[in-house]
Amino acid sequence: KIIEKADIVKPLLIGSVAPDLFMIDTINGKAVNKMGFDTAKTSDAVTKLYYKNMDELPPMYKTLSSVQAKYLVLVFWDVECGHCQTEIPKLLEIYHDLRKTIDVKVFSVYTVDEFDKWRKYIIDKKLDWINVYDPIHINNIKTKYDIFSTPKVYLLDKNKIIKSKHMPVDKIPDLIKAYEEEEKAKRIAGETQRKIAE
């Protein structure tokens, strides 16, 4: 069991590239449900639906790797989670403040399949970031990202390197500020070394 757990968390270590995700957003969620994924009860049924709709699905995917931003907040959450109901609105406020001065995006992953409940929450709370879920179950997100409770928050850089993880959302501005200061110090040190070398 310990080795299994180590194999799961190894790709999630700070400094690692975040595992990619192939997700469906709210716009394409209805189309995927019409294909029958919302009523498929077994993995065999989902597999058959996947192969039946294989040509239509790839253009619908939103991938983590395709999101372009200097900083990317990756958050896994559930509408029914009491802690998420506190943290997600806080994250929205932080996101709106941060994006005024820094290139930051949020890739918000719903960990359950209740599309209508999720979509209603997004509309009601005006979550204007990237909202995705996995109705096709191709990502195995709970294992891939070691999700045993929600919300689970990661802060990634522009190369999708995990900079921080498992922090409360109110720590995100301080973390980004620290990374910005670190980057500035490295840039100044590099310029100083170039001048000395000349």
Kindly label every feature range from the protein language model.
Residues 127, 137-179:
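Thiol/disulfide oxidoreductase modules built on the thioredoxin-like
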Residues 38-53, 170, 177-198:
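Sec-dependent signal peptide cleavage junction
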Residues 23-24, 76, 155:
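Hydrophobic beta-strand positions
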Residues 101-117, 126-138:
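Thiol-based oxidoreductase modules, predominantly thioredoxin-like and allied folds used
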Residues 69-72, 86-109, 176-182:
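Conserved helix-turn-beta segment immediately C-terminal to the redox Cys motif
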Residues 1-20, 26-47, 192-198:
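N-terminal targeting signals for export/organelle localization
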Residues 30-33, 74, 82-87, 100, ...:
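Extended hydrophobic-aromatic, low-complexity segments
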Residues 34-91, 105:
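Short active-site neighborhood of thiol/selenol oxidoreductases, capturing the structured segment around
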